[in-house]
Each structure stands twice: as C-alpha cells, then as structure tokens.
Amino acid sequence: MGQSAFLTNLSGYIPGSFKFVELLDRFYAAQHETGFIHRDVTFGTSEAYAQAFDPNSTGPNLLAWSEWRAFRLTGDKNRIAAVFPALMAHHRWCRDNRTWRNGLYWTTGYASELINQPRVPNGRYHHRHWAWIDACSQAVLNCTMLERMALLLEEAEMATEVATEQDRLIRVINSVMWNGELNFYQDVGPDGVFSPLKSIAAYWALLDAKLIPKDRLSPFIQHLRDTWSFRTEFVLPTLSADSDAYNARTGNGWRGAVWPHLTYMVQRGLNVAQHFPLAHKLALNHVDMVSRVHTSTDKFWENYMSEDLGPAEPMTEDVSGLTPAAIIPMVLEFVLGFSVDWPLRQIIWRRSLSPEQVYGVRNLPLGNEGTIDLLSDEDTIQIRTDAPITLIIHDNKEIFQTAVPAGEFALSLK
C-alpha cells in the first residue's frame, strides 16, 4: 500500500493517457464493507493477503495524501469525488481499530514499511502497545487531506468530523510524543518511555503544517543539518547516525540505509515547513549520489549506503520503479524548483541553481490541457505554453508574478 502510494508521485508528470494514481484503484476494489483496506493486493485482481485484525494487515495509510497530490497536479475533481467515500471509510476503520484510548495510532515495523528498524522492542510484527509516531503523523496528514476533499465536495459534516479528530490528535501528539531532551518526536511505550532511536519516521510530522509548534520546528529540523544525526555524507539515513542501532557499514535495511522515497518524503515536509534551501541541498546531494551509483552499476537500487558510495544491504535492484518515482519529482521540484498547482493554473519556480547555463524543463504537463517549456539563463526566461498560467518566480530573494497567455514568449528578469 505504501509503496504504491509513493509510485503515484509520478502522477501529473508523465504525459499520456496512463495515470499512475490509478495504481491505487486495486486497493479500493478490495475494500471490505467495514472500510478496511488490505496493504497487499495482487496486481490485476482484488485478492488480498491479510486479514483485517492481523496487526500487520494495513498501512501506511497514504492513500488520501497521494490522491490529493495527484489532484493538485491534474485538477481531476471527478476522481476525488469517486475515491473520497473509500478514503473516508478506511480512515474511520483505522480510527476505530488502530488507536489507543487517548486517540494515538499504532502500527508495526512490518506495516510501517520500516521492517527491521528496532524503534519499538520486539515490534516487527506487533504494536507492543506503543504509540508510533509515523502512524500518528500520517493520521494527522490524512485528516487534512480528507478535510480538503470534503470541502471541495461540499461535505461539511465530514470536514468537521476529521478536523475535530485532527485537533485532538495534534494536542496529544505534542503532549506525549515530543522528547524535549532531544528536540525530537519519538514512539512512546505504554509506560511513557520514549523509543531509544531517532527514526526518519518522525519526519512524517513535517508533512502537516499544523502539527509542529513554531518553537519546536527549527530544533526538530536541525537534526537534518547535524552530521552526527541525519546529515551523513549521503542523505538521508533511515536511522540517525547517533542511534545505537545505526549501521554505517552496510545500512542493514532500515537501520541506516538511504531509501530515496523516504528522502523525498522529508523534502516534501521541508517544503510544507517553508525550509526551501535545505530541501534543495538535500536533493542535490541525493540525486548526485544516485546518479553516480547508477553510472557505476547501470542499475537503480532500492536503498543506498549513507557513508559510502553504493547500494546498501540487502543489495536489491529496484524493479518496482520506486526509486525513479522519487528521483524524477525530486529533480523537478527540489533541484530545478518547479511547483505546479493546476486547479489554480499556477506554477512556482524557485530558481536556486546557478544561472550561468540555461536550465529548466520541457514538456511539463499542464493537467490535461497540454504542456509547457520553461528555460532560463541569468537574464531571461523562454516560455512556450499550451495554456494560460500564472507564473511566480523566486529569484535572488526577489519574487516576480506574471500572467502568461498561451503561446511563446521571452520574459526579462532584468
């Protein structure tokens, strides 16, 4: 379920009739009447492998997050209307069956897709009665996505329902799951003890702008800058380098290896938090590393070493497309700096690369209304667009905004 959600990052970026977001349809087809959706469904069928009350049966719940992103890139409101009932029903099932009395959510190592990360003792296949920070943060994010969908579809009661849950959940997360000594969000046991590890799972909290109080945001993000924490030579490790279980030599799965889709997730969170320069720097580091390894091995890999150049162990070639599905939007959004919001007919371009050479993008899809080319040097942006847009340019601490009609134009930055 989680990997399929990440594959949909390509939705809106690949021209043609195939829509990556439709990969999620097989999960909706397998949905139980209760609202439960299995995490494992075979391609081409609605056959599911897990039973609902198996602790490992579902998650991570990223479906609404992926659907809303696809909507912002394509403007396909009809799809939101079609999938919203399934998304709302699954959220309610998770709220009824994956929470503790205080409203915090649980998962397992397996269901979280950080399978061998020892953040919760003996938690690979069982929740151990802990509250898990990624499941809680994803639930907050899910509430935001569902509220936006409900408002779009004029479903006021359901918008209020998820907004009320979110307010309560944010309060409890910040009361219980913030480790003030470390300035970090962590899993919490039934006795109130924090996990002994700093996991990349905590950075799901960045994806919702309402979750982290302002006074906690900068120290929480600082861990992504500290070389003894998450700022290893190649970014970002799934465990901080100062965690006891961190494995610098092999990566050992989720005990320190770098997974491109999780690095991209953190960059998306930094974008929400408006820490754009850091997201850009992390993207440059990561894309360069993946490119160098691809040059030497002629392969994309599921995960990479954090302190040496090469694939991490277990050494597994990426055959699902998960790594390119992270790298392509990472290049477009955080290296080149493009952000498309098609319902608003708007493109933001944060120009962070050196303008000494011409750079930009060709054939960037504009929903279903054609494509756009945006190429620039230091002084001029060359534009060819099939549809009128609003273009907002962030350049050298200056912001330019202009309405661009369909056609070909040169825009001076002098």
Regions found by a protein language model. Give the residues of each.
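Aromatic-rich carbohydrate-recognition surfaces in CAZymes
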Residues: M1-T108, W132-C136, V140, G256-A273, ...
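Conserved hydrophobic/aromatic pocket- or pore-lining residues that grip, position, or stack substrates
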Residues: T8, Q166, A205
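Charge-dense, low-complexity intrinsically disordered segments
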Residues: I14, A81, H126-I133, L153-A156, ...
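Extended, well-ordered alpha-helical scaffold segments
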Residues: G16-A30, K77-N97, N142, L146-N174, ...
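Solvent-exposed, well-ordered amphipathic alpha-helical segments
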Residues: F20, A64, E147, T160-R171, ...
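Extended glycan-interaction surfaces of carbohydrate-active proteins
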Residues: E22-D54, T99-A131, R171-V258, S291-E313, ...
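Short, contiguous, pocket-lining structural segments
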Residues: H127-L141, M158-E161, E165, L197, ...
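Non-catalytic C-terminal accessory modules of carbohydrate-active enzymes
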Residues: I221-F230, M265-K414
